[in-house]
């Protein structure tokens, strides 16, 4: 039962975060122009990471990516890692 509750809460948070990303793309990003140093853009990376890994790991990957997106980092191609089927 707790597993179902935790899963439902995780899905709700994931939906909220994806909505925030979509809002950023349509409301803020057009004003800032293209300023991301990476491909895919940080918002696209965040969306993919959240969908692929869920809230906790996806958010961690997104934060790490955002910390590297600054004028002193060269940027480049940085895809979200593939999901491993291994049990850790």
Curated annotation (Swiss-Prot):
Alphabetical UniProt keywords: Cell inner membrane, Cell membrane, Membrane
Pfam families per record: YidD
UniProt family annotation: Belongs to the UPF0161 family.
Residues spanning the membrane: none
Any one Gene Ontology cellular component term annotated for this protein: plasma membrane
Membrane topology summary: Peripheral membrane protein
Name of the molecule in the record: Putative membrane protein insertion efficiency factor
HAMAP family named among the record's database cross-references: UPF0161_YidD
Function: Could be involved in insertion of integral membrane proteins into the membrane.
InterPro entries: Membr_insert_effic_factor_YidD
Superkingdom per UniProt: Bacteria
Subcellular location: Cell inner membrane
């Amino acid at each position: 039962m707790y597993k179902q509750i935790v899963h439902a809460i995780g899905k709700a948070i994931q939906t909220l975060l994806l909505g925030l990303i979509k809002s950023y793309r349509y409301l803020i990003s057009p004003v800032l122009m293209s300023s991301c140093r990476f491909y895919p853009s940080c918002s696209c990376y965040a969306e993919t990471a959240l969908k692929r890994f869920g809230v906790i790991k996806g958010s961690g990957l997104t934060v790490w990516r955002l910390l590297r997106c600054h004028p002193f980092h060269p940027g480049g191609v940085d895809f979200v890692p593939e999901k491993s089927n291994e049990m850790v």
